[in-house]
Amino acid sequence: MDEIDIGLFDRDWNNTLYYFILNADEQIYLRYGGRDSKAPDSYLDLNSLERALEKGLELHQQYREGKLPKRERPKALFPREIPLLVERTLARSACVECHLIGDFQNLQREQAGTLDKLKHLYRSPDLTTLGIHLDVPKGLVVKDASGAVRAAGVQAGDRISALNGLAVWTFGDLQYELDRISRDAKSVRLSVERGSEIHEFAIELPERWWWTDLTFRQWSVEPRVYFDSRPLSEAEKVQRALNKSGFASEVTHVDMFAEMMKSHQLRVGDVIIAIDGVDQDAVANTAELYIKLRKSAGSTVTLNVLRGGQRMEMPLKTYRLSFRK
């Protein structure tokens, strides 16, 4: 990737396979690839790839005939412009491998104070959070609609054709455009083909619609906490006389790493009430999410914990991963 324009070929770099269908004028017709947090190949299929390639040829013919408007070329960006990536690769006469790019971009942003964790860590929001379940071999045909999209009127059999007015031809296109939506957005416009008609729906985005499991990404900038938790319901908070708007959460799993490294002394069933005295956040609904969003990897925090009806404080040391090839 040493001389590749990663500004033009912009994507979520934590993908196993990713294709760009483009022409000699560097006009990208469509993308093919993408994944979810469950598996690297959830949306990869030979039939859908064939459909994508056929659509690419169709769009190319339209472009040659002047029927497809030319898009503005993205600003160029090369690996040599990311100092920490250069230090890790080019300065050591090593290759810039694609899986290094996203992590070192985030390290560079962290150093520069421009890291937006909602945008840069929680990449490629999951379509199923919106209620979109695709018939993968058929590309963007909806197999089942639930949640927000069903409430808006999307039906099984619809073919998704645009997001916020931008044409999408593949899962890769749709995921890429969804990833570009501001995490503060409350709604998006989804266009679908239904028979011979085009329908547009206003989709109300669920709370924390951008959240995904980060485990497979192995971000260096993500504080590793080595426990899982679930948010308490409002009734559970009232029962324990806790802040109804707070992020109090019950520990559901403690990783063996925490026990081995003694990074914290949490137990399953503990309720984390606050972090460093803070019990409420505009975004986070659990203690672990609060730490990931508001603390730096490698920092130590003080937990306010409720255990068996008794309140206590304990330290928790987060860990920073060193990116491994």
Q: Which positions does each model-derived feature cover?
A:
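PDZ-domain C-terminal substructure recognizer with occasional recognition of PDZ-binding tails
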Residues: S161, E177-L214, H264-R267, I273, ...
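PDZ/PDZ-like domain segments forming the peptide/carboxylate-binding groove
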Residues: R123-A162, L166-W169, P223-A274, V278-D281
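Thiol-based oxidoreductase modules, predominantly thioredoxin-like and allied folds used
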Residues: M1-I4
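Post-cleavage N-terminal segment of exported redox proteins
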Residues: Y32-R88
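The canonical Cys-X-X-Cys-His
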Residues: A91-G102
